[in-house]
């Protein structure tokens, strides 16, 4: 019973010490963060080229131009496969066996 009391007392002392050291380190880092000058300053004046493009959807044309070339090929192939009429079989192997 005495050992459990000693252990619980030791735990509470460790918790108190760790919370004090955490509070001290947080305060130290907060004071350093406040005193450090910002690395990047936002300018109040924007570029005249980017001012009409405020919406990310409006910038989607840039993303499409960055797609790899195989995506354009795959897109064209998919479009051509989808445009096949419903009466043809397209690339199915069963369509090649006309003599059976």
Curated annotation (Swiss-Prot):
InterPro entries from the UniProt entry: NFD6/NOXY2-like
Presequence extent in this chain: 1-29
Tagged with keyword Mitochondrion: yes
Subcellular location: Mitochondrion
Gene Ontology CC entries for this record: mitochondrion
Keyword terms of this UniProt record: Developmental protein, Karyogamy, Mitochondrion, Transit peptide
Chief location of this protein within or outside the cell: mitochondrion
Phenotypic consequence of gene deletion: Failure of fusion of the polar nuclei during megagametogenesis.
GO BP: any one term: polar nucleus fusion
Intrachain disulfide bonds: none
PANTHER family found in the cross-reference section: OS02G0230000 PROTEIN (PTHR33156), PROTEIN NUCLEAR FUSION DEFECTIVE 6, MITOCHONDRIAL (PTHR33156:SF48)
Function field: Required for karyogamy during female gametophyte development, when the two polar nuclei fuse to form the diploid central cell nucleus.
Protein's UniProt name: Protein NUCLEAR FUSION DEFECTIVE 6, mitochondrial
Species this protein is from: Arabidopsis thaliana
Organism classification: Eukaryota, Viridiplantae, Streptophyta, Embryophyta, Tracheophyta
Name of the encoding gene: NFD6
């Amino acid at each position: 019973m005495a050992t459990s009391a000693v252990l619980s007392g030791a735990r509470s002392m460790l918790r108190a010490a760790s919370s004090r050291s955490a509070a001290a380190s947080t305060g130290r880092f907060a004071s350093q963060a406040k005193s450090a000058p910002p690395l990047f300053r936002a300018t109040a004046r924007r570029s005249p080229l980017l001012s009409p493009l405020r919406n990310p959807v409006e910038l989607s044309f840039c993303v499409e131009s960055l797609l790899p070339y195989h995506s354009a090929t795959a897109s064209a192939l998919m479009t051509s496969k989808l445009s096949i009429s419903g009466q043809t079989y397209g690339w199915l192997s069963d369509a090649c066996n006309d003599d059976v």
